[in-house]
Amino acid sequence: MLDSFKENEALRKYLFSGHFGLEKENIRVTSDGKLALTPHPAIFGPKEDNPYIKTDFSESQIEMITPVTDSIDAVYEWLENLHNIVSLRAENELLWPSSNPPILPAEEDIPIAEYKTPDSPDRKYREHLAKGYGKKIQLLSGIHYNFSFPEALIDGLYAEISHPNESKRDFKNRLYLKVAKYFMKNRWLLIYLTGASPVYLADFTKTNSEEVLNDGSKALHRGISLRNSNAGYKNKESLFVDYNSFDAYISSISNYIEAGKIESMREFYNPIRLKNAHTDQTVESLAKHGVEYLEIRSIDLNPLEPNGISKDELIFIHLFLIKGLLSEDRELCANNQQLADENENNIALNGLAQPAIKNCDNEEMSLADAGLLELDKMSDFIQSLIPNDNHFQAIIEKQKERLLHPEKTIAAQVQAQSAKEGYVEFHLNQAKTYMEETEALAYKLVGAEDMELSTQIIWKDAIARGIKVDVLDRAENFLRFQKGDHVEYVKQASKTSKDNYVSVLMMENKVVTKLVLAEHGIRVPFGDSFSDQALALEAFSLFEDKQIVVKPKSTNYGWGISIFKNKFTLEDYQEALNIAFSYDSSVIIEEFIPGDEFRFLVINDKVEAVLKRVPANVTGDGIHTVRQLVEEKNTDPLRGTDHLKPLEKIRTGPEETLMLSMQNLSWDSIPKAEEIIYLRENSNVSTGGDSIDYTEEMDDYFKEIAIRATQVLDAKICGVDIIVPRETIDRDKHAIIELNFNPAMHMHCFPYQGEKKKIGDKILDFLFE
């Protein structure tokens, strides 16, 4: 078969691609490493309805399922995002990073997963497993790796090497059977290289190859993977199926079901299973539709990786499957399966001692030699098909290092750290470290960092609920959300089907906004608008002795605004006009209202968040210049540009320069220690300001004003900016200075100070409930 790829460049390009899907199980634990007995987090909804986040056997055993993707990069991004979403939503709990369980309660207190009804087929199946195998063993967790070859690859091979009169369906079945046979024979190598469960608690199980560690936990003596050993999660007896043909494979599984050895194909716990994409996962469905993908079930959670597996491990498993496709198709009889099982168990229990491997002729070869033989073959076919590759070869070289140096295996490192820190402490420390890393980047959706932060937030919140998300226009942050038959289109996180078009037009035009609000008795600053810069300049005498604001008529995010609270010159006024007219063809000059500026986020006639916005500023140290202080403050990892991070970097543009000049300062001025220098007069977070949550502290009087303003304009998702007087006695001197039809949500979700609000959830509630 290798020759087919050497001679056919069009076919060769498909060999190293494919379709990938991952399923990952983690136990939810308390901060002291005990099984969490809390219900599955409600935000994820019923397990039956969420395609991404479910439970495995136990209510405490969360399962993350990626959609099918066309690359390992994409499936890994999905896995990382799901892991982060689940970690952040499992409040006050951690995700246990080991395949082997944490501290468990009594058997009868381990909760089986709950479903909508007590007689749910999923619930009944789990009750059957609990009765037949016990609950504790069900808590062994791992990763399932789902893979299929590209259809174009199968079509090309079918045209070149299919048997006479063989249908494409039969050819496809035969192809996947061949790969499965290779996997079954050589899975010992994968277990040696990826196994990561050599340590376990003393009361979990007992093996014939164990030693007691200092903390009382147990470790397999020179072992690799408890989960993949005979003491792991296996069928009660070995089930050898017939791999000679697809029909024989189906018949042998059917016979085991009829004999009562297993209840259904779901209970066929082979390390690799032939599957199709139909939800009816029965042997009859597989026989009818044929093989569509392979499910690899023997991968341990890697406690050394935040997401339980590395991207290079995923790539290596892919190469392993390609090797199976290119290998000679050999018989896998019951005797050979018995030998393969023995190799698997021997490596799982004693792999670090590097026991000999038996081939199908019952001949022995050292583990290192047998492993290097397979890895060299991988290296050879990669070299012959993609001679300029470096990445794949580097991954294979790393596996060779693990064969030659057992101490470099994942299992050896896990065992060493567990012996040093204790089984529970080591895995708890890993879980806490990963949680801290997740929390530090809680605002981010991996793979969507180029999109607005508010879009990333609502996208993540949609995934948590099992809502399907399609990107319609990446540059425009335009998404489609779908839950069942319900579809919603959302742009920039807050432009939705609930918007009234004329309301948007009114809010976009600040003159119209003020006029309509004033007509309804809502206080707004008085002022004038100008479309001619020369006329605006001539009006200087009307404003020179007043406190004023100069701003574009139709802009957002606080851009182009200048505020004069003190005496200003004609030159200052002219520069403010230049700035404002650079953003719009019309500007507004209005009175300055003293007080503090607050953003009220109103969703469907309810104030969901209130934020105090402090203008962009730096604090002096008596040593550094203003410019240097800005540069230092901008190094905060939470500050970015274009709304890609929770806080915006402070700019050094004309607005900031003007503000400094009004204070008789320049960029080279050195402020005194603890002296606060403001770089902007307006307090918009989008111009580098700091955000402080005030939702609970804000007087309901002003919340009602914000709601009334949105009702006047019939705005359903709206940011209302209100200047609130500092003295309660002056509260009637407030003023609404702006209504925003596309309010940013990220500053409420990740404020500089104060409580984080789940605004994405609030918008999704509004759209879908």
UniProtKB/Swiss-Prot annotation:
The keyword Transmembrane does not apply. Mg(2+) 2 binds at E738, N740. Mg(2+) 1 binds at D721, E738. Its EC number is 6.3.2.2, 6.3.2.3. Keywords: ATP-binding, Glutathione biosynthesis, Ligase, Magnesium, Manganese, Metal-binding, Multifunctional enzyme, Nucleotide-binding. Pathway: Sulfur metabolism; glutathione biosynthesis; glutathione from L-cysteine and L-glutamate: step 1/2; Sulfur metabolism; glutathione biosynthesis; glutathione from L-cysteine and L-glutamate: step 2/2. Disulfide bonds: none annotated. Mn(2+) 1 binds at D721, E738. NCBIfam families: glu_cys_lig_rel, PRK02471.1. This is Glutathione biosynthesis bifunctional protein GshAB.
